[in-house]
A protein has these predicted regions:
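N-terminal lobe of the biotin/lipoate ligase/transferase fold
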Residues: 1-120, 282
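Long, positively charged amphipathic alpha-helical accessory segments at protein N-termini or as interdomain linkers
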Residues: 2-17, 21, 96-98, 102, ...
Length: 284
């Protein structure tokens, strides 16, 4: 894949048919850690970053777009990506034990939640384990993590403004938006400013936490995660991913490997990874 200079990104990527006209990609100001590539519309920022990883780019390579034609989230689920959101993926190459790698997605969720709260202090984002970001019980942002080619692609989709065309989301959560207002025939100057702030704040928060995670592991973030944890001390039903069995219990938190701590009916706390179970329902 050809790696373009910053000035060459204006029209890279295919524009979706019938999509609103977008004058230009965002132009966030970020630290030298990030090699930022900004686009108006692409098929998938994840695919761009994954191809870059295969080509051997160093960590910090980052792609951000205002629209995607083929965006996806965890476990390949479709992530609708119309104008109104910000879709960002970045490459990291952490040298850590394999069991530590899944916790990077939890660290990313903390970075995204913190960044969005900086942009809008009243949104009070919470985290749905392992790594979705909620606001007022609606899905505000989704995060994916894929390991390949000696590195990791972290993808983040944020609902900033409501798109003109209504869309549906998989799962039991409705959609939430960071800001009031609807995107109709393109982005206003104010909307572009806010979306630029989202990317800048998110990458700044991620860079800071990534460095700490490399040195201290996820244990250094457990208290922060607990403060934003939407499930704490709630009774839940959990389904095994590779079977039909359902587990009932009270969610007590997460451990240093990012596993959900579930107290069963006899008082035993059992750790469960996101590769083993997913939460199907909560008692409010």
């Amino acid at each position: 894949m050809e790696v373009l200079s910053r000035s060459e990104h204006q029209n890279n990527g295919r524009v979706a048919k019938g999509a609103p006209s977008v004058a230009a990609p965002l132009r966030p100001a970020v630290s030298s850690f990030w090699d930022l590539h900004a686009y108006a519309c692409v098929r998938s920022t994840n695919e761009l970053v994954k191809e870059a990883l295969r080509q051997g780019v160093p960590e910090g390579y980052c792609a951000t777009a205002l629209e995607q034609e083929g965006g996806y989230g965890r476990q390949g689920r479709v992530w609708a990506s119309p104008l109104g959101g910000v879709y960002t993926s970045f490459a990291l190459r952490p040298s850590v034990p394999p069991q530590m790698l899944p916790t990077l997605s939890l660290v990313a969720s903390l970075a995204v939640a913190d960044a969005l709260e900086r942009v809008r202090s009243s949104c009070n984002p919470l985290i749905k384990w392992p790594n979705d970001v909620l606001c007022s019980e609606g899905k505000l942002a989704g995060i994916s993590l894929e390991a390949l080619a000696g590195g990791v692609c972290v993808g983040v989709g944020v609902n900033v403004y409501e798109p003109f065309a209504k869309r549906e989301v998989e799962g039991k959560y409705s959609l939430a938006y960071l800001q009031d207002g609807v995107v109709e025939a393109g982005l206003s100057a104010e909307q572009r400013t806010v979306m630029t702030q989202v990317v800048e704040s998110m990458l700044e928060a991620m860079e800071c936490r990534y460095g700490r995670w490399l040195q201290e592991g996820f244990s250094a973030f457990i208290d922060e995660y607990s403060q934003r944890f939407a499930y704490r001390d709630k009774r839940a039903s959990l389904a095994l991913i590779n079977g039909d069995e359902t587990i009932e219990g009270i969610i007590r938190g997460v451990d240093g490997l990012g596993r959900l701590l579930v107290e069963n009916d006899v008082g035993i706390v059992v750790p469960m990874s996101s590769g083993e179970v997913h939460v199907t329902s909560l008692q409010r």
